[in-house]
UniProtKB/Swiss-Prot annotation:
Name used for this protein in its record: 1-deoxy-D-xylulose-5-phosphate synthase
Record keywords, A-Z: Isoprene biosynthesis, Magnesium, Metal-binding, Thiamine biosynthesis, Thiamine pyrophosphate, Transferase
Transmembrane segments: none
Protein residues bound to thiamine diphosphate: 74, 115-117, 147-148, 175, 282, 363
Pathway info: Metabolic intermediate biosynthesis; 1-deoxy-D-xylulose 5-phosphate biosynthesis; 1-deoxy-D-xylulose 5-phosphate from D-glyceraldehyde 3-phosphate and pyruvate: step 1/1
Ligand binding (Mg(2+)): 146, 175
SUPFAM superfamilies in alphabetical order: Thiamin diphosphate-binding fold (THDP-binding), TK C-terminal domain-like
UniProt-listed PANTHER family: 1-D-DEOXYXYLULOSE 5-PHOSPHATE SYNTHASE-RELATED, 1-DEOXY-D-XYLULOSE-5-PHOSPHATE SYNTHASE, CHLOROPLASTIC
Length: 614
Protein backbone atom coordinates (compact mmCIF):
# COMPACT_ATOMS: atom_id res chain seq x y z
CA UNK A 1 0.00 0.00 0.00
CA UNK A 2 2.87 2.36 0.82
CA UNK A 3 5.67 0.66 -1.11
CA UNK A 4 7.11 3.85 -2.59
CA UNK A 5 6.70 5.85 0.61
CA UNK A 6 8.41 3.13 2.63
CA UNK A 7 11.48 3.50 0.41
CA UNK A 8 11.89 7.13 1.47
CA UNK A 9 13.91 7.49 4.66
CA UNK A 10 15.46 10.87 3.91
CA UNK A 11 15.21 13.68 1.35
CA UNK A 12 18.17 12.12 -0.44
CA UNK A 13 15.97 9.12 -1.26
CA UNK A 14 13.25 11.50 -2.42
CA UNK A 15 15.56 13.32 -4.83
CA UNK A 16 16.28 10.08 -6.70
CA UNK A 17 12.66 9.78 -7.82
CA UNK A 18 11.42 10.98 -11.20
CA UNK A 19 8.47 13.34 -11.61
CA UNK A 20 5.97 10.54 -12.27
CA UNK A 21 7.00 8.79 -9.07
CA UNK A 22 6.53 12.02 -7.11
CA UNK A 23 2.84 12.06 -7.98
CA UNK A 24 2.47 8.50 -6.70
CA UNK A 25 4.44 9.42 -3.60
CA UNK A 26 2.01 12.26 -2.89
CA UNK A 27 -0.92 9.86 -3.17
CA UNK A 28 0.67 7.36 -0.78
CA UNK A 29 1.77 10.05 1.65
CA UNK A 30 -1.74 11.49 1.82
CA UNK A 31 -3.26 8.04 2.41
CA UNK A 32 -0.68 7.29 5.10
CA UNK A 33 -1.43 10.59 6.83
CA UNK A 34 -5.15 9.92 6.96
CA UNK A 35 -4.78 6.41 8.36
CA UNK A 36 -2.04 7.39 10.80
CA UNK A 37 -3.78 10.42 12.32
CA UNK A 38 -7.01 8.39 12.52
CA UNK A 39 -5.20 6.15 15.02
CA UNK A 40 -3.43 8.81 17.08
CA UNK A 41 -5.41 12.00 16.67
CA UNK A 42 -3.67 15.23 15.79
CA UNK A 43 -3.73 17.91 13.14
CA UNK A 44 -4.99 16.67 9.79
CA UNK A 45 -6.46 19.39 7.54
CA UNK A 46 -3.34 21.52 7.49
CA UNK A 47 -1.09 18.54 6.77
CA UNK A 48 -3.19 17.29 3.87
CA UNK A 49 -2.90 20.77 2.41
CA UNK A 50 0.91 20.81 2.23
CA UNK A 51 1.72 17.33 0.91
CA UNK A 52 2.83 18.53 -2.53
CA UNK A 53 4.64 21.58 -1.16
CA UNK A 54 6.59 19.46 1.32
CA UNK A 55 7.66 17.03 -1.38
CA UNK A 56 8.69 19.87 -3.70
CA UNK A 57 10.70 21.69 -1.03
CA UNK A 58 12.74 18.64 -0.08
CA UNK A 59 13.11 17.70 -3.76
CA UNK A 60 14.45 21.08 -4.87
CA UNK A 61 16.39 22.31 -1.87
CA UNK A 62 19.34 20.64 -0.18
CA UNK A 63 17.80 20.08 3.22
CA UNK A 64 18.92 20.15 5.98
CA UNK A 65 21.77 22.37 4.72
CA UNK A 66 19.13 24.64 3.25
CA UNK A 67 16.91 25.78 6.11
CA UNK A 68 13.13 25.37 5.99
CA UNK A 69 11.21 27.01 8.85
CA UNK A 70 7.57 25.97 9.22
CA UNK A 71 5.33 28.58 10.80
CA UNK A 72 3.19 27.27 13.69
CA UNK A 73 4.43 23.77 12.86
CA UNK A 74 1.19 21.80 13.05
CA UNK A 75 1.51 21.13 9.29
CA UNK A 76 4.85 19.30 9.54
CA UNK A 77 3.66 15.68 9.58
CA UNK A 78 4.57 15.17 5.88
CA UNK A 79 7.93 16.79 6.62
CA UNK A 80 8.52 14.42 9.52
CA UNK A 81 7.50 11.40 7.47
CA UNK A 82 9.89 12.29 4.63
CA UNK A 83 12.79 12.99 7.00
CA UNK A 84 13.09 9.59 8.61
CA UNK A 85 10.27 9.57 11.14
CA UNK A 86 7.61 7.61 9.29
CA UNK A 87 7.87 4.65 11.65
CA UNK A 88 7.46 6.96 14.64
CA UNK A 89 4.10 8.33 13.53
CA UNK A 90 2.27 5.63 15.48
CA UNK A 91 3.46 7.35 18.66
CA UNK A 92 2.78 10.89 17.50
CA UNK A 93 2.10 13.19 20.49
CA UNK A 94 2.20 10.22 22.86
CA UNK A 95 4.53 9.81 25.85
CA UNK A 96 8.03 9.14 24.56
CA UNK A 97 6.89 9.62 20.96
CA UNK A 98 7.57 12.35 18.45
CA UNK A 99 6.08 15.79 18.95
CA UNK A 100 3.26 17.28 16.91
CA UNK A 101 5.43 20.31 16.15
CA UNK A 102 9.02 20.80 14.92
CA UNK A 103 11.67 20.20 17.57
CA UNK A 104 15.34 21.01 17.07
CA UNK A 105 16.23 18.23 19.48
CA UNK A 106 14.17 15.70 17.49
CA UNK A 107 15.74 15.99 14.03
CA UNK A 108 18.39 17.98 12.17
CA UNK A 109 15.68 18.69 9.60
CA UNK A 110 13.67 20.60 12.21
CA UNK A 111 15.60 23.84 11.90
CA UNK A 112 13.48 25.88 14.31
CA UNK A 113 11.04 24.93 17.04
CA UNK A 114 7.55 26.32 16.54
CA UNK A 115 4.06 26.02 17.98
CA UNK A 116 2.89 29.62 18.11
CA UNK A 117 2.22 31.50 14.91
CA UNK A 118 3.99 34.14 12.83
CA UNK A 119 7.59 33.47 13.91
CA UNK A 120 8.90 31.81 10.75
CA UNK A 121 9.92 34.87 8.73
CA UNK A 122 11.90 36.35 11.61
CA UNK A 123 13.69 33.05 12.27
CA UNK A 124 14.41 32.38 8.60
CA UNK A 125 15.72 35.92 8.17
CA UNK A 126 18.06 35.42 11.11
CA UNK A 127 19.33 32.22 9.49
CA UNK A 128 19.76 33.99 6.14
CA UNK A 129 21.83 36.74 7.75
CA UNK A 130 23.90 34.13 9.61
CA UNK A 131 24.61 32.41 6.29
CA UNK A 132 25.61 35.74 4.78
CA UNK A 133 27.95 36.54 7.66
CA UNK A 134 29.62 33.12 7.58
CA UNK A 135 30.05 33.04 3.80
CA UNK A 136 27.56 30.23 3.22
CA UNK A 137 25.39 30.08 0.10
CA UNK A 138 22.63 28.07 1.75
CA UNK A 139 19.00 29.09 1.33
CA UNK A 140 16.55 30.09 4.07
CA UNK A 141 12.86 29.41 3.51
CA UNK A 142 9.89 30.41 5.67
CA UNK A 143 6.55 28.66 5.07
CA UNK A 144 3.72 30.71 6.54
CA UNK A 145 -0.06 30.42 6.25
CA UNK A 146 -2.46 33.21 5.41
CA UNK A 147 -3.83 33.07 8.96
CA UNK A 148 -0.39 33.63 10.49
CA UNK A 149 0.16 36.51 8.09
CA UNK A 150 -2.49 38.49 9.97
CA UNK A 151 -0.15 38.87 12.95
CA UNK A 152 1.94 41.98 13.36
CA UNK A 153 5.15 40.03 13.93
CA UNK A 154 5.02 38.67 10.39
CA UNK A 155 4.89 42.19 8.99
CA UNK A 156 7.67 43.38 11.26
CA UNK A 157 9.82 40.63 9.78
CA UNK A 158 8.76 41.40 6.19
CA UNK A 159 9.60 45.05 6.72
CA UNK A 160 13.05 44.15 8.03
CA UNK A 161 13.75 41.44 5.45
CA UNK A 162 12.81 43.58 2.47
CA UNK A 163 15.45 46.12 3.39
CA UNK A 164 18.20 43.50 3.49
CA UNK A 165 20.08 41.72 0.76
CA UNK A 166 19.74 38.33 2.45
CA UNK A 167 18.69 35.31 0.42
CA UNK A 168 15.35 34.50 2.00
CA UNK A 169 12.31 32.90 0.41
CA UNK A 170 8.92 33.44 2.05
CA UNK A 171 6.23 31.02 0.88
CA UNK A 172 2.70 32.17 1.63
CA UNK A 173 0.54 29.06 1.90
CA UNK A 174 -2.84 30.62 1.15
CA UNK A 175 -5.53 28.11 2.09
CA UNK A 176 -8.06 30.76 3.06
CA UNK A 177 -8.43 29.34 6.54
CA UNK A 178 -6.52 29.33 9.80
CA UNK A 179 -8.32 27.70 12.76
CA UNK A 180 -11.12 30.20 12.40
CA UNK A 181 -11.84 31.96 9.09
CA UNK A 182 -9.35 34.75 8.57
CA UNK A 183 -10.53 38.28 9.00
CA UNK A 184 -9.50 41.82 8.31
CA UNK A 185 -8.14 44.00 5.57
CA UNK A 186 -5.18 41.77 4.72
CA UNK A 187 -7.37 38.76 4.05
CA UNK A 188 -9.62 40.87 1.86
CA UNK A 189 -6.55 42.11 0.03
CA UNK A 190 -5.32 38.57 -0.62
CA UNK A 191 -8.77 37.52 -1.80
CA UNK A 192 -8.84 40.38 -4.28
CA UNK A 193 -5.35 39.48 -5.38
CA UNK A 194 -6.50 35.96 -6.17
CA UNK A 195 -9.73 36.93 -7.89
CA UNK A 196 -8.73 40.12 -9.67
CA UNK A 197 -8.40 40.68 -13.44
CA UNK A 198 -5.28 39.90 -15.38
CA UNK A 199 -2.64 42.57 -15.04
CA UNK A 200 -0.70 43.55 -18.12
CA UNK A 201 2.47 44.63 -16.38
CA UNK A 202 4.62 41.72 -15.37
CA UNK A 203 7.87 41.97 -13.53
CA UNK A 204 10.76 40.51 -15.50
CA UNK A 205 11.98 38.37 -12.65
CA UNK A 206 8.50 37.01 -12.11
CA UNK A 207 8.25 36.22 -15.82
CA UNK A 208 11.60 34.48 -15.68
CA UNK A 209 10.54 32.32 -12.75
CA UNK A 210 7.09 31.38 -13.95
CA UNK A 211 8.24 30.87 -17.53
CA UNK A 212 6.29 27.94 -18.83
CA UNK A 213 4.20 27.56 -15.68
CA UNK A 214 0.54 27.42 -16.69
CA UNK A 215 -1.87 29.92 -15.16
CA UNK A 216 -3.95 28.86 -12.19
CA UNK A 217 -7.55 28.31 -13.29
CA UNK A 218 -10.56 27.49 -11.22
CA UNK A 219 -8.40 26.32 -8.33
CA UNK A 220 -10.30 25.29 -5.21
CA UNK A 221 -13.57 26.70 -6.53
CA UNK A 222 -12.31 30.27 -6.52
CA UNK A 223 -13.86 32.86 -8.83
CA UNK A 224 -13.61 32.39 -12.59
CA UNK A 225 -11.19 35.23 -12.95
CA UNK A 226 -9.04 33.66 -10.22
CA UNK A 227 -5.58 34.24 -11.43
CA UNK A 228 -4.26 34.04 -14.76
CA UNK A 229 -2.40 36.21 -12.70
CA UNK A 230 0.80 37.87 -12.09
CA UNK A 231 0.97 41.09 -10.15
CA UNK A 232 2.19 44.60 -10.65
CA UNK A 233 5.25 45.97 -8.87
CA UNK A 234 2.87 47.98 -6.71
CA UNK A 235 1.53 45.08 -4.69
CA UNK A 236 1.85 44.92 -0.95
CA UNK A 237 4.72 42.45 -0.78
CA UNK A 238 6.76 44.19 -3.44
CA UNK A 239 6.35 47.41 -1.50
CA UNK A 240 8.12 45.58 1.32
CA UNK A 241 11.05 44.97 -1.02
CA UNK A 242 10.31 41.39 -2.07
CA UNK A 243 10.17 39.98 -5.56
CA UNK A 244 6.61 38.64 -5.64
CA UNK A 245 5.84 35.50 -7.66
CA UNK A 246 2.48 33.82 -8.01
CA UNK A 247 -0.06 32.80 -7.05
CA UNK A 248 0.43 29.25 -8.27
CA UNK A 249 -1.37 25.97 -7.62
CA UNK A 250 0.10 24.53 -4.44
CA UNK A 251 -1.13 21.03 -5.29
CA UNK A 252 0.64 20.82 -8.66
CA UNK A 253 4.00 19.22 -7.96
CA UNK A 254 5.37 19.99 -11.41
CA UNK A 255 4.49 23.68 -11.14
CA UNK A 256 5.95 23.85 -7.64
CA UNK A 257 9.22 22.20 -8.62
CA UNK A 258 9.71 24.36 -11.71
CA UNK A 259 8.97 27.53 -9.79
CA UNK A 260 11.13 26.65 -6.79
CA UNK A 261 14.06 25.70 -9.00
CA UNK A 262 13.92 29.05 -10.73
CA UNK A 263 13.58 30.94 -7.44
CA UNK A 264 16.57 29.03 -6.11
CA UNK A 265 18.74 30.85 -8.66
CA UNK A 266 17.56 34.33 -7.65
CA UNK A 267 19.24 36.52 -5.06
CA UNK A 268 17.64 38.67 -2.41
CA UNK A 269 14.21 38.49 -0.76
CA UNK A 270 11.72 36.37 -2.72
CA UNK A 271 8.01 35.90 -2.03
CA UNK A 272 6.11 32.93 -3.47
CA UNK A 273 2.34 32.87 -3.14
CA UNK A 274 0.75 29.42 -3.44
CA UNK A 275 -2.93 28.53 -3.28
CA UNK A 276 -3.84 25.33 -1.44
CA UNK A 277 -6.84 23.66 0.13
CA UNK A 278 -6.93 22.45 3.72
CA UNK A 279 -7.93 18.81 3.89
CA UNK A 280 -7.07 18.33 0.20
CA UNK A 281 -7.65 14.79 -1.01
CA UNK A 282 -9.86 13.63 1.87
CA UNK A 283 -13.51 14.52 1.38
CA UNK A 284 -14.56 14.75 5.04
CA UNK A 285 -11.70 17.17 5.74
CA UNK A 286 -12.39 19.18 2.59
CA UNK A 287 -16.03 19.52 3.65
CA UNK A 288 -15.19 20.48 7.24
CA UNK A 289 -11.56 21.57 7.57
CA UNK A 290 -12.21 23.20 10.94
CA UNK A 291 -13.34 19.91 12.48
CA UNK A 292 -10.22 18.19 11.15
CA UNK A 293 -7.81 20.94 12.15
CA UNK A 294 -7.23 19.19 15.45
CA UNK A 295 -9.01 15.87 15.68
CA UNK A 296 -9.20 12.88 17.98
CA UNK A 297 -9.29 9.31 16.76
CA UNK A 298 -11.69 8.79 13.87
CA UNK A 299 -12.84 6.23 11.33
CA UNK A 300 -10.85 6.99 8.16
CA UNK A 301 -13.53 5.43 5.96
CA UNK A 302 -16.05 8.14 6.79
CA UNK A 303 -14.34 10.69 9.05
CA UNK A 304 -16.62 9.99 12.01
CA UNK A 305 -15.08 10.55 15.43
CA UNK A 306 -14.42 7.62 17.73
CA UNK A 307 -15.28 9.63 20.81
CA UNK A 308 -16.18 8.59 24.30
CA UNK A 309 -18.98 10.44 26.04
CA UNK A 310 -17.47 12.68 28.66
CA UNK A 311 -18.25 15.34 31.22
CA UNK A 312 -18.96 18.90 30.22
CA UNK A 313 -15.67 20.70 29.61
CA UNK A 314 -14.70 23.98 31.20
CA UNK A 315 -14.76 25.49 27.72
CA UNK A 316 -18.40 24.46 27.41
CA UNK A 317 -19.15 25.90 30.85
CA UNK A 318 -17.70 29.21 29.68
CA UNK A 319 -19.64 29.03 26.41
CA UNK A 320 -22.94 28.52 28.23
CA UNK A 321 -22.22 31.31 30.71
CA UNK A 322 -21.24 33.75 27.96
CA UNK A 323 -24.53 33.26 26.10
CA UNK A 324 -26.53 33.58 29.33
CA UNK A 325 -24.67 36.69 30.42
CA UNK A 326 -24.94 38.31 27.00
CA UNK A 327 -28.71 37.87 27.13
CA UNK A 328 -28.73 39.79 30.42
CA UNK A 329 -26.32 42.57 29.50
CA UNK A 330 -26.24 44.09 26.02
CA UNK A 331 -22.93 45.80 26.84
CA UNK A 332 -21.13 42.44 26.77
CA UNK A 333 -18.86 41.90 23.76
CA UNK A 334 -16.78 38.78 23.07
CA UNK A 335 -13.28 38.94 21.62
CA UNK A 336 -11.02 36.12 20.44
CA UNK A 337 -7.71 36.05 18.55
CA UNK A 338 -8.63 33.44 15.91
CA UNK A 339 -9.78 30.78 18.39
CA UNK A 340 -13.56 31.00 18.17
CA UNK A 341 -14.21 27.26 18.26
CA UNK A 342 -11.41 26.29 20.64
CA UNK A 343 -12.31 28.99 23.16
CA UNK A 344 -16.02 28.23 23.11
CA UNK A 345 -17.38 31.31 21.34
CA UNK A 346 -19.30 29.61 18.52
CA UNK A 347 -22.69 29.72 20.24
CA UNK A 348 -22.19 33.34 21.27
CA UNK A 349 -21.12 34.29 17.74
CA UNK A 350 -24.23 32.66 16.28
CA UNK A 351 -26.65 34.30 18.71
CA UNK A 352 -24.95 37.69 19.00
CA UNK A 353 -23.01 38.18 15.75
CA UNK A 354 -22.90 41.97 16.12
CA UNK A 355 -21.19 41.63 19.50
CA UNK A 356 -18.62 39.02 18.47
CA UNK A 357 -15.15 40.04 17.32
CA UNK A 358 -12.58 37.62 15.93
CA UNK A 359 -9.55 39.84 15.42
CA UNK A 360 -7.37 37.19 13.80
CA UNK A 361 -4.04 35.96 15.12
CA UNK A 362 -3.36 39.29 16.79
CA UNK A 363 -3.22 38.88 20.55
CA UNK A 364 -1.61 42.27 21.18
CA UNK A 365 -4.29 44.05 19.19
CA UNK A 366 -7.03 41.98 20.85
CA UNK A 367 -6.16 43.31 24.30
CA UNK A 368 -5.80 46.96 23.37
CA UNK A 369 -8.94 46.70 21.23
CA UNK A 370 -10.73 45.43 24.35
CA UNK A 371 -9.23 48.26 26.38
CA UNK A 372 -10.64 50.82 23.97
CA UNK A 373 -14.07 49.24 24.21
CA UNK A 374 -13.91 49.28 28.01
CA UNK A 375 -13.01 52.98 27.97
CA UNK A 376 -16.34 53.81 26.37
CA UNK A 377 -18.80 51.71 28.29
CA UNK A 378 -18.69 48.24 26.76
CA UNK A 379 -17.92 45.13 28.81
CA UNK A 380 -15.32 43.11 26.86
CA UNK A 381 -14.72 39.44 27.56
CA UNK A 382 -11.47 38.20 26.02
CA UNK A 383 -11.43 34.42 25.53
CA UNK A 384 -7.86 33.28 25.06
CA UNK A 385 -5.58 30.33 25.71
CA UNK A 386 -3.08 30.81 28.53
CA UNK A 387 -0.15 30.15 26.20
CA UNK A 388 -1.30 32.81 23.72
CA UNK A 389 -1.92 35.43 26.40
CA UNK A 390 1.85 35.47 26.88
CA UNK A 391 2.12 37.21 23.51
CA UNK A 392 0.26 40.29 24.78
CA UNK A 393 1.86 40.84 28.16
CA UNK A 394 2.76 44.49 27.63
CA UNK A 395 -0.76 45.29 26.47
CA UNK A 396 -2.13 43.62 29.59
CA UNK A 397 0.02 45.81 31.82
CA UNK A 398 0.18 49.10 29.93
CA UNK A 399 -3.20 49.30 28.23
CA UNK A 400 -5.50 47.50 30.68
CA UNK A 401 -4.12 47.12 34.21
CA UNK A 402 -2.41 50.51 34.40
CA UNK A 403 -5.71 52.18 33.53
CA UNK A 404 -7.69 49.76 35.73
CA UNK A 405 -10.09 49.00 32.89
CA UNK A 406 -12.89 46.42 33.34
CA UNK A 407 -11.67 43.85 30.84
CA UNK A 408 -12.43 40.24 31.73
CA UNK A 409 -10.19 37.36 30.66
CA UNK A 410 -11.45 33.80 30.26
CA UNK A 411 -8.11 31.98 30.24
CA UNK A 412 -8.52 28.51 28.75
CA UNK A 413 -5.97 25.65 28.69
CA UNK A 414 -4.40 26.74 31.99
CA UNK A 415 -1.93 24.16 33.26
CA UNK A 416 -0.76 21.13 31.31
CA UNK A 417 -2.44 20.43 27.97
CA UNK A 418 -1.47 16.84 27.21
CA UNK A 419 -0.59 15.93 23.64
CA UNK A 420 0.11 19.47 22.41
CA UNK A 421 3.10 19.68 24.71
CA UNK A 422 5.22 22.55 26.03
CA UNK A 423 4.49 25.07 23.26
CA UNK A 424 0.83 25.09 24.24
CA UNK A 425 1.03 24.48 27.99
CA UNK A 426 -0.48 27.13 30.25
CA UNK A 427 2.18 26.72 32.89
CA UNK A 428 3.03 30.33 33.66
CA UNK A 429 -0.07 32.54 33.78
CA UNK A 430 -0.35 32.71 37.56
CA UNK A 431 3.32 33.66 37.79
CA UNK A 432 3.21 36.38 35.17
CA UNK A 433 -0.21 37.79 36.08
CA UNK A 434 -0.22 37.96 39.87
CA UNK A 435 2.58 40.55 39.95
CA UNK A 436 0.43 43.03 37.99
CA UNK A 437 -1.41 45.63 40.11
CA UNK A 438 -5.20 46.06 39.96
CA UNK A 439 -5.99 42.54 38.71
CA UNK A 440 -8.03 39.84 40.41
CA UNK A 441 -7.32 36.19 39.52
CA UNK A 442 -9.57 33.20 40.18
CA UNK A 443 -9.10 29.47 39.65
CA UNK A 444 -12.21 27.24 39.84
CA UNK A 445 -12.13 23.81 41.42
CA UNK A 446 -15.19 22.52 39.55
CA UNK A 447 -17.64 23.39 36.79
CA UNK A 448 -20.22 25.20 38.92
CA UNK A 449 -17.60 27.24 40.69
CA UNK A 450 -16.27 28.20 37.27
CA UNK A 451 -19.67 29.60 36.28
CA UNK A 452 -19.90 31.66 39.46
CA UNK A 453 -16.35 32.93 39.06
CA UNK A 454 -17.05 34.03 35.50
CA UNK A 455 -20.03 36.00 36.78
CA UNK A 456 -17.97 37.50 39.60
CA UNK A 457 -15.17 38.49 37.25
CA UNK A 458 -17.60 40.06 34.80
CA UNK A 459 -19.10 42.30 37.48
CA UNK A 460 -15.71 43.40 38.80
CA UNK A 461 -14.88 47.02 38.02
CA UNK A 462 -11.33 46.40 36.89
CA UNK A 463 -9.17 43.77 35.16
CA UNK A 464 -10.15 40.22 36.06
CA UNK A 465 -9.13 36.72 35.03
CA UNK A 466 -10.60 33.26 35.46
CA UNK A 467 -8.14 30.51 34.53
CA UNK A 468 -9.38 26.99 33.92
CA UNK A 469 -7.86 23.80 32.50
CA UNK A 470 -8.41 21.95 29.27
CA UNK A 471 -11.07 19.26 29.35
CA UNK A 472 -13.61 18.43 32.00
CA UNK A 473 -13.79 18.91 35.73
CA UNK A 474 -14.92 16.56 38.50
CA UNK A 475 -18.53 16.56 37.24
CA UNK A 476 -20.20 19.03 39.59
CA UNK A 477 -23.84 19.95 39.06
CA UNK A 478 -24.06 23.34 37.38
CA UNK A 479 -26.76 25.70 38.61
CA UNK A 480 -28.49 28.12 36.25
CA UNK A 481 -28.33 30.84 38.87
CA UNK A 482 -25.32 33.13 38.98
CA UNK A 483 -23.94 34.07 42.36
CA UNK A 484 -21.43 36.76 43.23
CA UNK A 485 -18.49 35.34 45.17
CA UNK A 486 -16.85 37.47 47.87
CA UNK A 487 -13.60 38.80 46.41
CA UNK A 488 -10.48 37.31 47.94
CA UNK A 489 -12.22 34.69 50.07
CA UNK A 490 -11.52 30.98 50.10
CA UNK A 491 -13.41 28.21 51.86
CA UNK A 492 -12.52 25.45 54.27
CA UNK A 493 -13.43 22.10 52.70
CA UNK A 494 -12.05 19.64 55.23
CA UNK A 495 -10.95 19.99 58.83
CA UNK A 496 -8.01 17.84 59.81
CA UNK A 497 -4.94 18.12 61.99
CA UNK A 498 -1.25 18.98 61.71
CA UNK A 499 -1.11 19.59 57.95
CA UNK A 500 -3.15 22.17 56.02
CA UNK A 501 -3.32 21.87 52.23
CA UNK A 502 -4.14 25.06 50.34
CA UNK A 503 -5.48 23.94 46.95
CA UNK A 504 -5.78 26.22 43.94
CA UNK A 505 -8.20 25.44 41.13
CA UNK A 506 -7.95 21.98 39.58
CA UNK A 507 -5.79 20.72 42.44
CA UNK A 508 -8.65 20.63 44.95
CA UNK A 509 -9.79 17.12 43.97
CA UNK A 510 -6.39 15.40 44.43
CA UNK A 511 -5.81 17.45 47.59
CA UNK A 512 -9.05 16.19 49.14
CA UNK A 513 -8.17 12.62 48.16
CA UNK A 514 -4.73 12.93 49.71
CA UNK A 515 -6.20 14.49 52.84
CA UNK A 516 -8.22 11.36 53.57
CA UNK A 517 -4.98 9.43 53.99
CA UNK A 518 -3.15 12.19 55.84
CA UNK A 519 -6.07 13.49 57.91
CA UNK A 520 -5.14 16.93 56.61
CA UNK A 521 -7.11 20.15 56.55
CA UNK A 522 -7.99 21.33 53.04
CA UNK A 523 -8.85 24.84 51.88
CA UNK A 524 -10.22 25.69 48.45
CA UNK A 525 -8.43 29.00 47.95
CA UNK A 526 -10.46 30.15 44.92
CA UNK A 527 -8.52 33.42 44.55
CA UNK A 528 -4.86 33.68 43.66
CA UNK A 529 -5.09 37.46 43.87
CA UNK A 530 -6.16 38.81 46.26
CA UNK A 531 -5.37 35.91 48.55
CA UNK A 532 -7.50 35.13 51.57
CA UNK A 533 -4.88 36.34 54.04
CA UNK A 534 -7.10 35.74 57.05
CA UNK A 535 -7.67 32.10 56.12
CA UNK A 536 -3.98 31.55 55.40
CA UNK A 537 -2.85 33.09 58.66
CA UNK A 538 -5.48 31.19 60.62
CA UNK A 539 -4.41 27.85 59.16
CA UNK A 540 -0.71 28.65 59.45
CA UNK A 541 -1.15 29.47 63.13
CA UNK A 542 -2.99 26.22 63.89
CA UNK A 543 -1.02 23.68 61.82
CA UNK A 544 2.58 22.50 61.77
CA UNK A 545 2.89 22.48 57.98
CA UNK A 546 1.28 24.49 55.18
CA UNK A 547 1.18 22.82 51.75
CA UNK A 548 0.22 24.68 48.58
CA UNK A 549 -0.83 22.79 45.45
CA UNK A 550 -1.28 24.37 42.01
CA UNK A 551 -1.19 23.42 38.32
CA UNK A 552 1.19 26.24 37.49
CA UNK A 553 4.94 26.74 37.63
CA UNK A 554 5.94 26.53 41.28
CA UNK A 555 8.34 29.42 40.75
CA UNK A 556 6.46 32.65 41.28
CA UNK A 557 3.08 30.97 41.42
CA UNK A 558 0.32 30.75 44.00
CA UNK A 559 2.54 28.99 46.52
CA UNK A 560 5.05 31.81 46.37
CA UNK A 561 2.19 34.24 46.96
CA UNK A 562 1.19 32.32 50.10
CA UNK A 563 4.75 32.49 51.42
CA UNK A 564 4.82 36.24 50.78
CA UNK A 565 1.53 36.59 52.64
CA UNK A 566 2.84 34.67 55.65
CA UNK A 567 6.09 36.61 55.64
CA UNK A 568 4.15 39.89 55.71
CA UNK A 569 2.26 38.61 58.78
CA UNK A 570 5.54 37.43 60.39
CA UNK A 571 4.30 33.81 60.50
CA UNK A 572 7.06 31.22 60.32
CA UNK A 573 5.17 27.94 59.85
CA UNK A 574 7.03 25.74 57.33
CA UNK A 575 5.61 25.81 53.80
CA UNK A 576 5.82 23.12 51.12
CA UNK A 577 5.00 24.39 47.62
CA UNK A 578 3.87 21.80 45.08
CA UNK A 579 3.39 22.67 41.43
CA UNK A 580 4.94 22.30 38.01
CA UNK A 581 8.74 21.96 38.15
CA UNK A 582 11.23 24.41 36.65
CA UNK A 583 11.34 22.71 33.25
CA UNK A 584 9.38 22.44 30.02
CA UNK A 585 7.20 19.36 30.38
CA UNK A 586 6.96 17.08 27.35
CA UNK A 587 3.74 16.04 25.65
CA UNK A 588 1.78 13.08 26.94
CA UNK A 589 -1.46 12.08 28.63
CA UNK A 590 -2.64 14.76 31.06
CA UNK A 591 -3.26 12.46 34.03
CA UNK A 592 0.11 10.77 33.57
CA UNK A 593 1.87 14.12 33.27
CA UNK A 594 0.32 15.31 36.53
CA UNK A 595 1.41 12.12 38.26
CA UNK A 596 4.96 12.54 36.97
CA UNK A 597 4.95 16.06 38.43
CA UNK A 598 3.71 14.73 41.77
CA UNK A 599 0.37 16.49 41.42
CA UNK A 600 -1.96 13.54 41.90
CA UNK A 601 -3.09 12.29 45.30
CA UNK A 602 -0.23 9.80 45.60
CA UNK A 603 2.34 12.44 44.71
CA UNK A 604 0.92 14.91 47.22
CA UNK A 605 0.96 12.27 49.96
CA UNK A 606 4.54 11.26 49.15
CA UNK A 607 5.79 14.86 49.15
CA UNK A 608 4.13 15.66 52.47
CA UNK A 609 5.34 12.47 54.17
CA UNK A 610 8.86 13.18 52.95
CA UNK A 611 8.68 16.71 54.34
CA UNK A 612 7.35 15.53 57.70
CA UNK A 613 10.13 12.97 58.14
CA UNK A 614 12.91 15.52 57.73
Amino acid sequence: MYELLESINSPEDLRRLDRKELHELARQLRAFLINSVAQTGGHLSSNLGVVELTIALHYVFNTPEDRVVWDVGHQTYPHKILTGRRKDMGNLRRPGGIAGFPRRDESIYDTFGTGHSSTSISAALGMAVAAQKTGSDRHSIAVIGDGAMTAGMAFEALNNAGAMDANILVILNDNDMSISPNVGALTNYLAKLLSGPLYTTVRRSGEKVLGVVPPVREFAKRAEEHVKGMVTPGTLFEEFGFNYIGPIDGHDIDVLITTLRNIRELKGPQFLHIATQKGHGYQPAEDNPGKFHGVGKFDPSNGCSIAQAGKKTYTQVFSDWLVDMAARDERLVGITPAMCDGSGLNAFAEQFPDRFFDVGIAEQHALTFAAGMACDGLKPVVAIYSTFLQRAYDQFIHDIALQNLPVMFAIDRAGLVGADGPTHAGSFDLSYLRCIPNIIIMAPSDENECRQMLYTAYLHDGPSAVRYPRGGGPGATITRDMQLLPIGKGELRRQGSWVAILAFGSMLAPALEAAETLDATVANMRFVKPLDANLINQLASSHTLIVTVEENAVMGGAGAAVMECMQAADIHTPVLCLGLPDMFIEHGVHETMLAECGLNAAGIIAAIEKKLTK
